[in-house]
């Protein structure tokens, strides 16, 4: 039985990475350094732009985060692909929250637009995921649109984020 809370702490997210939050059959979040959020502040089965589910999560920014030291030397910026991965992570987390079982895999994205950047001087990144559809058949899949904000300003959008849960990934 999934503990369907509306919010999750960093400790909860780390437990998900160890397979302890949604049980061993549920999807796992990655462990640090690839875990791209510090907390989930809202999860609902309704709401969002399509009234089919909504997730909001946050990442605290500080200049010591690992990616600022290598991307780029003398011009530190959070790689845009990490924001995209965070959105995929949240789609998979939501599928586990709904009770889905399997190993989460990103399946694609329709379009991504970058209109800003995350610098080491920022304070907080906010991720917003608006679910469009959940497929619960042989393959469990989530389809959503996402937004990334830095200190309240919209900087990335993604349409048609797709994540599936697989019982067997050997042929994937």
UniProtKB/Swiss-Prot annotation:
The active site is at residue 71. Gene3D superfamilies: Hotdog Thioesterase. It catalyses: a (3R)-hydroxyacyl-[ACP] = a (2E)-enoyl-[ACP] + H2O; (3R)-hydroxydecanoyl-[ACP] = (2E)-decenoyl-[ACP] + H2O; (2E)-decenoyl-[ACP] = (3Z)-decenoyl-[ACP]. Its EC number is 4.2.1.59, 5.3.3.14. GO terms for biological process: unsaturated fatty acid biosynthetic process. One of its GO terms (molecular function) is (3R)-hydroxyacyl-[acyl-carrier-protein] dehydratase activity. InterPro entries: FabA, FabA_FabZ, HotDog_dom_sf. Its main location: cytoplasm. Pfam families: FabA. CDD domains: FabA (cd01287). Pathway: Lipid metabolism; fatty acid biosynthesis. Keywords: Cytoplasm, Fatty acid biosynthesis, Fatty acid metabolism, Isomerase, Lipid biosynthesis, Lipid metabolism, Lyase. This is 3-hydroxydecanoyl-[acyl-carrier-protein] dehydratase. It comes from Escherichia coli O6:K15:H31 (strain 536 / UPEC). The gene is fabA.
């Amino acid at each position: 039985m999934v503990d369907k809370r509306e919010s999750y702490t960093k400790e909860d997210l780390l437990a998900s990475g160890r397979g302890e939050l949604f049980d061993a059959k549920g999807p796992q979040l990655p462990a640090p350094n690839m875990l791209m959020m510090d907390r989930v502040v809202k999860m609902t089965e309704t709401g969002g732009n399509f009234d089919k589910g909504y997730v909001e999560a946050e990442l605290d920014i500080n200049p010591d985060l690992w990616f600022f030291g290598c991307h780029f030397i003398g011009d530190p910026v959070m790689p845009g692909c990490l924001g995209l991965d965070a959105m995929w992570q949240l789609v998979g987390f939501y599928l586990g929250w709904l009770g889905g079982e399997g190993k989460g895999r990103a399946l694609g994205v329709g379009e991504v637009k970058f209109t800003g950047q995350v610098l080491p001087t920022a304070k907080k990144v906010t991720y917003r995921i608006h679910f469009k559809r959940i497929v619960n058949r042989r393959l469990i899949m989530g389809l959503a649109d996402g937004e990334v904000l830095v200190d309240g300003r919209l900087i990335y959008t993604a349409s048609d984020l797709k994540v599936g849960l697989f019982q067997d990934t050997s042929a994937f």
